[in-house]
Amino acid sequence: MVRRDRLRRMREWWVQVGLLAVPLLAAYLHIPPPQLSPALHSWKSSGKFFTYKGLRIFYQDSVGVVGSPEIVVLLHGFPTSSYDWYKIWEGLTLRFHRVIALDFLGFGFSDKPRPHHYSIFEQASIVEALLRHLGLQNRRINLLSHDYGDIVAQELLYRYKQNRSGRLTIKSLCLSNGGIFPETHRPLLLQKLLKDGGVLSPILTRLMNFFVFSRGLTPVFGPYTRPSESELWDMWAGIRNNDGNLVIDSLLQYINQRKKFRRRWVGALASVTIPIHFIYGPLDPVNPYPEFLELYRKTLPRSTVSILDDHISHYPQLEDPMGFLNAYMGFINSF
């Protein structure tokens, strides 16, 4: 009798916990995205949108040096946005006539459809469509990329080499801290859990919050160059815009695509004839030193490399903007 009473009380307790948890969970899942900071709001307001197959794509397009024919297109990394380039933006406008960056589909202020099969191929096609939209499809383009953007740049380079219809005419390519080799790439734990699209993926993406995001992203920065809390909130606001946290697992399919299409994308780099450069933050846990750099130099012996200070990690353009900009300008002015 005593045991039955105890079991009954336990059941009642769990029912009460469940009744309390349901509205709390519902409230958690409907937390609105954070307000944009003044700086991020200004970035959005100064940008524009164009439409690609019914989807809105955000981009920035600044006119810099008058009379210069030079154009640079910036390709951002995962899981952030074109705002990653804001620290070097003004410096680029002092060298280039046009400085252009976009938020890839599923990132930043661009649309984030779901369900959707996100792919590197589609992102490359969006870059090509943007330049057609701007009337620059026949101009020679300098590509500057980071992380995820490096893989998109590899596909654009492949199309350029194959003389594909609609492809960009690439003048130069500068990569930075991207996992261009599947065998030396070390994805974070959450990326490993989400990239295979298992039963946990929709749960984890819905439960992701600022705390989880910031604790996951901060370790890929150097110990002296980690972002402030306000900078992390700007990154998180870009992800949460249009419920972007719910498509992270779909976007991460690029890890599997990179392995599947290694020959295509690494082959495009290995046989490159245009000027190519790599800017490297050597403390990067995602593309670790020295394994990554050894393979890069072996695969691309013609490429030049800039290694930044020892404490610079995975986001060199944010951690050491002046060092990054100087390295890039040194490359651009070398040919």
UniProtKB/Swiss-Prot annotation:
<feature type="glycosylation site" description="N-linked (GlcNAc...) asparagine">
    <location>
        <position position="163"/>
    </location>
</feature>
<dbReference type="GO" id="GO:0016787">
    <property type="term" value="F:hydrolase activity"/>
</dbReference>
<keyword id="KW-0256">Endoplasmic reticulum</keyword>
<comment type="similarity">
    <text>Belongs to the AB hydrolase superfamily.</text>
</comment>
<feature type="transmembrane region" description="Helical">
    <location>
        <begin position="63"/>
        <end position="83"/>
    </location>
</feature>
<feature type="transmembrane region" description="Helical">
    <location>
        <begin position="266"/>
        <end position="286"/>
    </location>
</feature>
<keyword id="KW-0378">Hydrolase</keyword>
<dbReference type="InterPro" id="IPR000639">
    <property type="entry name" value="Epox_hydrolase-like"/>
</dbReference>
<keyword id="KW-0472">Membrane</keyword>
<protein>
    <recommendedName>
        <fullName>Mesoderm-specific transcript homolog protein</fullName>
        <ecNumber>3.-.-.-</ecNumber>
    </recommendedName>
</protein>
<dbReference type="GO" id="GO:0007498">
    <property type="term" value="P:mesoderm development"/>
</dbReference>
<dbReference type="GO" id="GO:0032526">
    <property type="term" value="P:response to retinoic acid"/>
</dbReference>
<dbReference type="GO" id="GO:0070062">
    <property type="term" value="C:extracellular exosome"/>
</dbReference>
<dbReference type="InterPro" id="IPR050266">
    <property type="entry name" value="AB_hydrolase_sf"/>
</dbReference>
<keyword id="KW-0812">Transmembrane</keyword>
<dbReference type="InterPro" id="IPR029058">
    <property type="entry name" value="AB_hydrolase_fold"/>
</dbReference>
<dbReference type="GO" id="GO:0010883">
    <property type="term" value="P:regulation of lipid storage"/>
</dbReference>
<keyword id="KW-0325">Glycoprotein</keyword>
<dbReference type="InterPro" id="IPR000073">
    <property type="entry name" value="AB_hydrolase_1"/>
</dbReference>
<feature type="domain" description="AB hydrolase-1">
    <location>
        <begin position="71"/>
        <end position="310"/>
    </location>
</feature>
<feature type="short sequence motif" description="RVIALD">
    <location>
        <begin position="98"/>
        <end position="103"/>
    </location>
</feature>
<feature type="transmembrane region" description="Helical">
    <location>
        <begin position="13"/>
        <end position="33"/>
    </location>
</feature>
<dbReference type="GO" id="GO:0005789">
    <property type="term" value="C:endoplasmic reticulum membrane"/>
</dbReference>
<keyword id="KW-1133">Transmembrane helix</keyword>
<dbReference type="Pfam" id="PF00561">
    <property type="entry name" value="Abhydrolase_1"/>
</dbReference>
<dbReference type="GO" id="GO:0005783">
    <property type="term" value="C:endoplasmic reticulum"/>
</dbReference>
